[in-house]
Amino acid sequence: MLHNIRIVLVETSHTGNMGSTARAMKTMGLTNLYLVNPLVKPDSQAIALSAGASDVIGKATIVDTLDEALAGCSLVVGTSARSRTLPWPMLEPRECGVRSAREAEHAPVALVFGRERVGLTNDELQKCHYHVAIPANPEYSSLNLAMAVQILAYEVRVAYLDRQQANAPVEEEEEAPYPLVDDLERFYQHLEQVLSHSGFIRQAHPGQIMSKLRRLFTRARPEAQELNILRGMLTSIEKQDKYPQRGTGDTAGKSKD
């Protein structure tokens, strides 16, 4: 299960934080590190601060975009302070660990950490199913990157060990499969296209409508079959109203006999 947990760092600017993160991961049994458009590449300082976890640094996957790091994941949790400007489903660290451990038995799970100074952007946070806030001292809530990784990695390990001790059979607890983030993004693109052609939203300025719809579907979290039904509905609307069709390579959402 632990091999399915991805620790994703977005635009990290200090190699020392990469090394300290690798150390925090390895102490909890996590080894799958993704670096999204790092401002610096891992170097000798990263190796030194990894304190024996240089293998995690050496195997790190470096990608250009967050979408690449999230590809194939069924659950994405982004670290964020609570925000009134972008209300989103929130998790406490303990619940984050429990959900991550459970879903990682069936598909990859990504825990996403933002830039050292400014965190994740709103657009990046909207790619997450949940946000997690670490309840630090409000009078001094300054956690560095590796500390935040250590806390969430610990919660994942505790949940993993609890499941091991309970000897919970995967078959008995298997939930209906959720769509991967790639499928969700294609659904959102399809939805925006149909709403634009219908005149419900302005294609050049979708504004807050798509953000609110993303939040709605994030709360509902449709299963894979339910998402296929929604895609099929959109495809039916396109055909009925004779909208321009999408590329022939995109077959998602078509009904099956």
Swiss-Prot record:
Entry keyword set: Cytoplasm, Methyltransferase, S-adenosyl-L-methionine, Transferase, tRNA processing
Binding site for S-adenosyl-L-methionine: 79-81, 114, 134, 141-143
First-tier enzyme category under EC: transferase
Catalyzed chemical reaction(s): cytidine(32) in tRNA + S-adenosyl-L-methionine = 2'-O-methylcytidine(32) in tRNA + S-adenosyl-L-homocysteine + H(+); uridine(32) in tRNA + S-adenosyl-L-methionine = 2'-O-methyluridine(32) in tRNA + S-adenosyl-L-homocysteine + H(+)
GO molecular function, one term: RNA binding
Principal place of residence: cytoplasm
Cellular component aspect of the GO annotation: cytosol
Subcellular location per the Swiss-Prot or TrEMBL entry: Cytoplasm
Record has Transferase as a keyword: yes
Family annotation (NCBIfam families): PRK15114.1, rRNA_methyl_1
Chain's role: Catalyzes the formation of 2'O-methylated cytidine (Cm32) or 2'O-methylated uridine (Um32) at position 32 in tRNA.
Family statement: Belongs to the class IV-like SAM-binding methyltransferase superfamily. RNA methyltransferase TrmH family.
Name of the protein in question: tRNA (cytidine/uridine-2'-O-)-methyltransferase TrmJ
